[in-house]
Amino acid sequence: MITRLPGLLSRATNYAHIVDTPDAWAMVTDIYSSVYWLAARHRWMDLAELAVIKQGLAAERATPLAGIIAVRDEAGTFLNSGDFEGGLAVVDRAVVHAELSMEGREKALGLGLLHLRGLTLAGRRRDKKEVERHMAAAWRMVEEFPQDVDVCGMQFGPENTATHVMATWVDLEHYRRALNVAGDLGRRTLTLPATRIGPLYMNAARAKLALHDRDGALNSLVDAWEASPQMAKVSSTSQELLRVLISLHKRSNPTLTKLAKQARVGI
């Protein structure tokens, strides 16, 4: 994907300049969103921030939903840099704008995506009041989507909302709550893509490790690698979990040794 994006972006941008329609510019914002996502996963932060700036410029000519996704990614740069308060301010401004300018299912989808980003930011900030506000709002938007939908690579619905809730409970150190959510999800046949299933297992591993369940944490980390190996390889969460598990295991563990080799982490 990394090798294909430059050419795809060039062609989409040229096309958007020729036809100059909101849908054409929405394609450009979608590609920049992919650039941002990949750059953030690899921790190429300068590229991630540049992609979001370009995405925002394209979004000025694009569809309202493309604009929502651009704001969501902009707030993501604040999340990546640790400026959770700044990210929440970006989200809140976008929520107000969406409430006034959008309608129908598209409005519910846009607001849902924004509130999930706000939920993550509030959890990292450990602001329980903001967590409750964004969580409640996200679940209200889910009422419009009984099944998860994928729009421009963004998922929204009951499953993806639950994965965000679970991650936030881990951030707030409510580990049992997090694992209860994971257990509920585990009893379903999930429709989410691998890029969402992988983090679900990683967060389960975080919760289990915090509860001193080393074997359970390792099993969940293995599940994350099996669900999304490319993501697990570059994820800072996966890398940190692996290092901690290596430090805790006094005896050789074949499963841990295999994961360390895949991740190129020394034992």
Task: State what each model feature region is.
Residues M1-I267:
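Conserved binding/catalytic microenvironments
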